[in-house]
C-alpha cells in the first residue's frame, strides 16, 4: 500500500481566526467583527481590505458565540422514516427550501421506522440546539418531547400525528384517498378486492384500511378477512400475502396496495400471473407510468406537505402562539391502466 500523503507539508487543525484577519488587513479586531457581522461604522476601503484578507485566509465565522448571545441557532431538524423512500425526497427538498428562505440550515436523519431510533435522533438534534423540528414519527408516544417543547423548540409532525401530545400536524387525506382507490376498482366491476398495507401500528396504514372498508361497505360489499393483510412491507411478506389472495378458492380480482413499496412487489407478482389482475397503489413512484400496464395510483403531494409543515414551524418560531393546527392535504387518483382492468371471468 502506498501512502500518498507521506511527505506533505499540509497542516490540519489551524483554522484562521479573526485575529489573523485583523493582522493581514492591518485593522483592529472590532473592525473585523463589524465587517463579519454586517454592522455599520466601517469605511468602504477598510471593508474591502478586510474582505480580501478573509478570502485570502479562507476565514469562516465561528457561530458558537453568536448563538450563545442570541439564543437561536438558525437551524432546524428533520427526522424522516427512510431517506431512500421516493416519498420523502420531495418533502425533504421542500422543507429545505423554506428553511433556506428563512436563513436556516436543515439537518436531517432517518429513523428507519424504529421508535427508539426516532427518539435518539430527536434528542440528539435538541442537544445541538436546533430551533425547531419537523418529524415523521415512527413511534406513538412523544411525551419525551414535552420538556423540549416547553423549553421553546417548535415542533411539527408530518404524515402521521404525534402520539399522546398536542402538536401541529400535516397529513395526507389517507382515508379519502383509499376510498377513492377502492371506489374506482368497484366502478370497474370488481367485487373481491384485496388490501395489502403497512404495519397496523402506523397511522397511515390504519387510515387507508379504514378507507378501504368504508368504500366496500358503501357499495354493499362484504370484506373477507383473507382479503386484508397488514404487516411489514418486506417483499417476501407482500409476495406471500398477494399470492394467498390470488390463489384462494374465491380469488380477489383486484389489489389495493397500501404504499409504493407494496405496489412495486405487487407489480412483480402480478407480472407472473396468467390472468390480468387490477391494481391501484397508494403513492406514486418513479416509472409507474412506464411499466405495462401503467400503474393507477393515489398520488400524494409530499412537496406541499413539506412546505406546509415548514411554514407552520417558522410561524411558531416567529412567536405565533395558538392551539395546534391540523392540516390535511388532498390526494389525487391518477388512472393509467392497471386500475381499469375488468375482473377476469370465473
What are these regions (language model features)?
Residues 1-74, 343:
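N-terminal helix-turn-helix DNA-binding module of bacterial transcription factors
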Residues 20, 26, 36, 58, ...:
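Conserved functional loop/turn residues at catalytic and ligand-binding sites
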Residues 24, 29-34, 68-84, 184, ...:
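Short beta-strand segments enriched in small/hydrophobic residues
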Residues 112-115, 136-141, 260-261:
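Short beta->alpha connector loops
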Amino acid at each position: 500500500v502506498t501512502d500518498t500523503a507521506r511527505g506533505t507539508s499540509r497542516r490540519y487543525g489551524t483554522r484562521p481566526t479573526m485575529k489573523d484577519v485583523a493582522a493581514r488587513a492591518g485593522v483592529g479586531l472590532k473592525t473585523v467583527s463589524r465587517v463579519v457581522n454586517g454592522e455599520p461604522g466601517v469605511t468602504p476601503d477598510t471593508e474591502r481590505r478586510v474582505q480580501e484578507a478573509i478570502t485570502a485566509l479562507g476565514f469562516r465565522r465561528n457561530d458558537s458565540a453568536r448563538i450563545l448571545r442570541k439564543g437561536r441557532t438558525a437551524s432546524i431538524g428533520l427526522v424522516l422514516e427512510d431517506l431512500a423512500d421516493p416519498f420523502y425526497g420531495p418533502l425533504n427538498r421542500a422543507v429545505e427550501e423554506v428553511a433556506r428562505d428563512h436563513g436556516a440550515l436543515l439537518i436531517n436523519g432517518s429513523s428507519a421506522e424504529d421508535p427508539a431510533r426516532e427518539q435518539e435522533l430527536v434528542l440528539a438534534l435538541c442537544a445541538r440546539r436546533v430551533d425547531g423540528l419537523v418529524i415523521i414519527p415512527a413511534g406513538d408516544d412523544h411525551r419525551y418531547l414535552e420538556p423540549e417543547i416547553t423549553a421553546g423548540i417548535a415542533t411539527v409532525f408530518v404524515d402521521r400525528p404525534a402520539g399522546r401530545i398536542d402538536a401541529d400536524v400535516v397529513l395526507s387525506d389517507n382515508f379519502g384517498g383509499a376510498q377513492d382507490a377502492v371506489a374506482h376498482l368497484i366502478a370497474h366491476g370488481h367485487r373481491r378486492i384485496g388490501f395489502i398495507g403497512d404495519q397496523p401500528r402506523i397511522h397511515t396504514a390504519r387510515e387507508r384500511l379504514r378507507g378501504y372498508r368504508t368504500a366496500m361497505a358503501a357499495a354493499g360489499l362484504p370484506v373477507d378477512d383473507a382479503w386484508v393483510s397488514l404487516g411489514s412491507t418486506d417483499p417476501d411478506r407482500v409476495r406471500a400475502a398477494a399470492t394467498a389472495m390470488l390463489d384462494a378458492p374465491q380469488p380477489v380480482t383486484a389489489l389495493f396496495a397500501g404504499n409504493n413499496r407494496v405496489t412495486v412487489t405487487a407489480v412483480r407478482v402480478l407480472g407472473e400471473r396468467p390472468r390480468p389482475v387490477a391494481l391501484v397503489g397508494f403513492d406514486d413512484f418513479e416509472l409507474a407510468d412506464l411499466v405495462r400496464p401503467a400503474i393507477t395510483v393515489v398520488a400524494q403531494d409530499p412537496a406541499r406537505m413539506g412546505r406546509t409543515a415548514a411554514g407552520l414551524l417558522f410561524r411558531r418560531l416567529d412567536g405565533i402562539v395558538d392551539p395546534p393546527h391540523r392540516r390535511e392535504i388532498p390526494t389525487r387518483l391518477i388512472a393509467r391502466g392497471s386500475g381499469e382492468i375488468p375482473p377476469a371471468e370465473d
